[in-house]
């Protein structure tokens, strides 16, 4: 992240103020203040980690993935008890994305659920949509299979199994 000395001074002052306003995180803000003041470029890269960008297409893909899970959950609810017993109920839970490798996706899902109020039925679990393993490729395969289903919101037990194993 390229910053002028004036920008570094402003950011340093902001970190100083934050350390005073939030004593519980003062050590974190003092560390960041030191990094900015001294210009440690390797560590300054971590300041940039939260300033990502998701394109409109990437946002729509995430919404499509979440909508697919919504459709699978609703379809499961419409199955009779015998069919429902054949569906692995754990696989119906939307796990989210891997915070280590798919951080922007995790943050977008959290934004959609927490700020926008979408998909309130999704269980945040203990990890708040951090699957702790890369999921995007798996979701893309599942999405392809789901899109090929003739009735995407009235899936049968067999179609659910096909989507799970995509």
Curated annotation (Swiss-Prot):
Pfam family name, one: YfbU
Q: What is the phylogenetic placement of the source species in the record?
A: Bacteria, Pseudomonadati, Pseudomonadota, Gammaproteobacteria, Vibrionales
Q: State what protein this is by name.
A: UPF0304 protein VP0990
Gene3D superfamilies this protein is in?
Helix hairpin bin, yfbu gene product, domain 2
Database matches in InterPro entries: UPF0304_YfbU, YfbU_alpha-helical_sf, YfbU_helix-hairpin_sf
What protein family is recorded? Answer: Belongs to the UPF0304 family.
* Domain of life, source organism: Bacteria
């Amino acid at each position: 992240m390229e910053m002028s000395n004036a920008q570094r001074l402003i950011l340093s002052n902001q970190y100083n103020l934050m350390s005073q306003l939030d004593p519980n995180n003062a050590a974190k803000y003092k560390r960041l203040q030191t990094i900015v003041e001294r210009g440690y470029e390797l560590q300054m890269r971590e300041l940039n980690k939260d300033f990502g960008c998701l394109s409109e297409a990437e946002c729509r893909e995430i919404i499509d993935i979440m909508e697919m899970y919504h459709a699978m959950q609703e379809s499961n609810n419409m199955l009779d008890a015998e069919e429902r017993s054949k569906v692995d109920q754990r696989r119906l839970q939307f796990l989210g994305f891997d915070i280590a490798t798919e951080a922007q996706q995790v943050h977008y899902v959290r934004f959609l659920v927490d700020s926008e109020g979408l998909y309130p039925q999704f269980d945040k679990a203990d990890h708040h949509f951090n699957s702790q393993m890369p999921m995007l490729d798996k979701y893309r395969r599942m999405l392809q299979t789901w899109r090929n289903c003739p009735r995407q919101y009235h899936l049968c037990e067999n179609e659910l199994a096909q989507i799970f194993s995509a």
